[in-house]
């Protein structure tokens, strides 16, 4: 109940906002929606505007964010990292523009830069003489957290600045790297990468992230940089703090300057001479948000001129020269009717919410993810609760948390069932894992269905024409009990089934038959072994060459492979030790599925790299990492995904992974650039050349013939 006493109400609002700031900025676990948080801030602003005597120095309206976590060293920002005022409609945008003109003068010539407001984690990067020396989070705007080691692992953040002078909009002397440069930007995670990461975490029995922003924030704030290096983080630069040695005049010039130095800058940023044009671009963004590969929660409109920015100044926590045009919330409140559990292909039990239908962003949502039992317990989510439901882009809607204030006492605490809902087997939970599992691997019908769906998926055997409905039909009718049974289907099975005419049946059976000859690593992916995705499957296929050899390998033998850890090795060995797995492999052979690696499509060009193990990091000048890897393999070498004492060379391109470079230096492993790699191949010499700074002229003398070989391998170097 809202108090009529403005003093008490202001104190209450400040405490609520501080608490929610702590949940959002420090714990990365918000418990209210963005719209509800904005409503609290608006009420406090209006209250303080009506009663100026209530404004205190520590009011949330006078600060940014929350105190930093004690987990990392604190960093004092020399130039504060400001927040932004928000506008929620065009009327708010026009009010901001009118205020700007009143301050600058009605005859002022004002240009605007409009940039997408990426929903990630704001960071600052400090470069001295072109070398990254420190990186920190925004924290409360005054003090952040030192996450330098973790930021170094993000490949889109340059460790040393270069010059890309072909950007005509950069300053007149883009080759001069400033002696001091502080770059501000956003660390984020693409939606597709987020979904893949959550799948991996769920399979591993680890805690999943609620959304891409939380995934990015949690990944960046890992204590171990090695963990961060395995997360698909990206970076966009959008501004500067401290700068020495270059006089930047505008925001637009700054964006081009940053791009010229090698920073990724969002190419959807635009400059406009008129406010109405800028506003029209904001409207366009509202219609495009679902088409993007990353989450945005609005657009930022900035006054382009730094001189005008300085004239406008800052009030409280917000610069007067910029505003965030926030998009309508992709959240809604609905009632949680029930919690049902689904069974995954590896037996993981996942709770899902059944809610009263609610429209979120033009889509009717009836079901939402609850991730796992711990997620429900930590947030005290109960059946009958009114809950906040969030949907963003193509990400599955999920429950953020309950609206506790709306409880009436009829809500029920949910408990994870003791047995599998599909087969009745008692559930198990391994020590240290958040996931419950059904151990009835070979018989549980839900696991069978999920495994077949995975087997036919694009990343595995890629069988066209088979989806969830088809698999359900096959299993319900008893035609298919395991993936090998797919290859026993005949036209007679489909006789009399509605929707299955002769042409559709022929296409379906042809697609199944064609999949028998898929590469070995695709088959390994299709088996659905825990922790085994495309990269691990390729390593296993390359080393063992057949399912028989892989099945006969011990966990120790598998663990010895580059890029394979003990958890993966144990999972693979455990899978092939099961009687049902052995029976499945025998059955796959009987129905004609290839269980051995295919011969090389192109005969090896030589053995110049025989016995040598390479790791590739960064962006190479004339070929992708995949193309470089194919070239190494064609000359007898092998490629690994991680640096270890077994690595012979690290091939380094621009913007390399900091962890790999540091590990190579620690182990004394020689590094090569692209020219050095080509020289090593062209010289047909297995001895290690001088590391890193090989003679470019000598390399070029041998590279023409080698590049011709790349073309013969069918590799596109454009």
From Swiss-Prot:
The organism's place on the tree of life at top rank: Bacteria
Residues that bind Zn(2+): 420, 423, 438, 444
Residue ranges constituting the BRCT domain according to the UniProt record: 604-694
GO molecular function annotations of the record: DNA binding; DNA ligase (NAD+) activity; metal ion binding
EC number: 6.5.1.2
Gene Ontology annotations of biological process type: DNA repair; DNA replication
Catalytic activity: NAD(+) + (deoxyribonucleotide)n-3'-hydroxyl + 5'-phospho-(deoxyribonucleotide)m = (deoxyribonucleotide)n+m + AMP + beta-nicotinamide D-nucleotide
Entry-linked Pfam families: BRCT (PF00533), DNA_ligase_aden (PF01653), DNA_ligase_OB (PF03120), DNA_ligase_ZBD (PF03119), HHH_2 (PF12826), HHH_5 (PF14520), Nlig-Ia (PF22745)
Active site: 117 (n6-amp-lysine intermediate)
Record PROSITE patterns: BRCT, DNA_LIGASE_N1
Binding site for NAD(+): 34-38, 83-84, 115, 138, 186, 302, 326
Keyword list, A-Z: DNA damage, DNA repair, DNA replication, Ligase, Magnesium, Manganese, Metal-binding, NAD, Zinc
Cofactor: Mg(2+); Mn(2+)
Protein family according to the UniProt entry: Belongs to the NAD-dependent DNA ligase family. LigA subfamily.
Purpose of the protein: DNA ligase that catalyzes the formation of phosphodiester linkages between 5'-phosphoryl and 3'-hydroxyl groups in double-stranded DNA using NAD as a coenzyme and as the energy source for the reaction. It is essential for DNA replication and repair of damaged DNA.
Protein name (database record): DNA ligase
Species per Swiss-Prot/TrEMBL record: Roseiflexus castenholzii (strain DSM 13941 / HLO8)
